């Protein structure tokens, strides 16, 4: 049973798909590494803030709130206030 060179070579479409898949995986890996670096940088900033006497939990809350839409944030604050009043916390 003889194998020809054409039979051993892969289809060009298969090669293209493999190359494309490899490129996608490598991009994801690079982005994951960048994400890790950025996460480390953010952690360092919070540590610096804590060292300067700031409350990290409050900072995280403010960052999260600033990401929200103003109307969404106002609605959540209203609900929170209503619940706190119902529990006698205000």
Curated annotation (Swiss-Prot):
GO molecular function: DNA binding
Assigned protein family: Belongs to the UPF0335 family.
Domain of life: Bacteria
Name this polypeptide is given: UPF0335 protein Rpal_4670
Parts of the chain that traverse the membrane: none
């Amino acid at each position: 049973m003889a194998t020809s060179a054409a039979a051993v070579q892969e289809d060009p479409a298969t090669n293209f798909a493999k190359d494309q898949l490899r490129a996608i995986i490598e991009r994801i890996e690079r982005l994951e590494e960048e994400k890790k670096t950025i996460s480390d940088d953010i952690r360092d900033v919070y540590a610096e803030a804590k060292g300067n006497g700031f409350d990290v939990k409050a900072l995280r809350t403010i960052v999260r709130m600033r990401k929200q839409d103003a109307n969404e944030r106002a609605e959540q604050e209203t609900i929170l206030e209503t619940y706190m009043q119902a529990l006698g916390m205000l």
